[in-house]
Amino acid sequence: MGDRTITYSPAFTLVPTYECFNRCTYCNFRQDIGTRGWLTLKAAAKQLAELDPQRVREILILSGEVAPNSPQRSKWLERLYDLAALALDQGFLPHTNAGPLTRAEMTALKAVNVSMGLMLEQLTPKLLQGVHRHAPSKDPQLRLHQLEQAGELGIPFTTGLLLGIGEAPQDWAETLTAIAEGHRRWGHIQEVILQPHSPGQQQAERLPPFDLKQLPQVVQWARSLLPEDITIQIPANLVTEPEVFRACLEAGARDLGGIVPLDHVNPDYPHTDLAVLKEQLQAWGWELVPRLPVYPQFVDWLPPPLKEKVKEIPV
């Protein structure tokens, strides 16, 4: 029958800032610059103090982006670093996703993150005239370079595709192939997320939702195109049709990502209660088990202080 294990990361999200210089038309996360203050270390410490380290392992640091040429950029990076260091001090394992970074920025954050991430989304440049026409950092070549840079720096990395934002099915194969090629060079990709576009109340333009009935086929293609040691992840809160969810697992999806109190990217789609989700999977013959934000095969890649932190935390 084979391995019938599905993993997830018990997680909590810290948002340094919702302000972002990109204006992706489908975004339900960003706010205009100057409309909301940044998360202070004091406020973050209060949020972390309310968590149970026995139940939460990962602190996802998910941030809006400050423009590369902004005078606020260095302050922003310092805040990302300090929040990750704070999470480590409180007994959690940080994973940062904050948009494209320079080599120096990525190197700095490597010291305080057990893994990092950036969605490639889609490799086709045509989206730069569509949903990404006001989003400079969504240049696909810039994002592909980030994957390469993470590999060169030996950073365990998560990436993925955003489905249903104006691309064609052949674009999925091109994007998956590019991820596979980068992983064959560096071996650093932990998982690839297949995220269906799911409309929310805050986005600037109404896009139709991705047709979930296509998702099992995308999972199947991903499994055939990606190396076997890359895990395929689907967000359980966005795959709202049970039979589609089940078909995705049978097609090769093996991880549900971070299960958090609030999905800040898709705030209109709450996660199913964990006990209910476990029961549902069990009825289908699957066992849901927690994991850390760094996969076991990558622990030895980490700087010694981080490696020790990981060893202190039970799965």
Curated annotation (Swiss-Prot):
What highest taxon heads this organism's lineage? Bacteria
Self-association or partners: how does it assemble? Answer: Consists of two subunits, CofG and CofH.
Describe which pathway this protein belongs to, using the record's wording. Cofactor biosynthesis; coenzyme F0 biosynthesis
Keyword S-adenosyl-L-methionine set for record: yes
Indicate whether Iron appears among the record's keywords: yes
Q: Name the gene behind this protein.
A: cofG
Protein name (database record): 7,8-didemethyl-8-hydroxy-5-deazariboflavin synthase
Which SMART domains is this protein grouped with? Elp3
Top-level EC class, please?
lyase
A Gene Ontology molecular function term of the record = 7,8-didemethyl-8-hydroxy-5-deazariboflavin synthase activity
Q: Which cofactor does it need?
A: [4Fe-4S] cluster
Q: How and how many cofactors are bound, per the record note?
A: Binds 1 [4Fe-4S] cluster. The cluster is coordinated with 3 cysteines and an exchangeable S-adenosyl-L-methionine.
Pfam families from the xrefs?
Answer: Radical_SAM
Which of UniProt's keywords are assigned here? Answer: 4Fe-4S, Iron, Iron-sulfur, Lyase, Metal-binding, S-adenosyl-L-methionine
Q: Which family does it belong to?
A: Belongs to the radical SAM superfamily. CofG family.
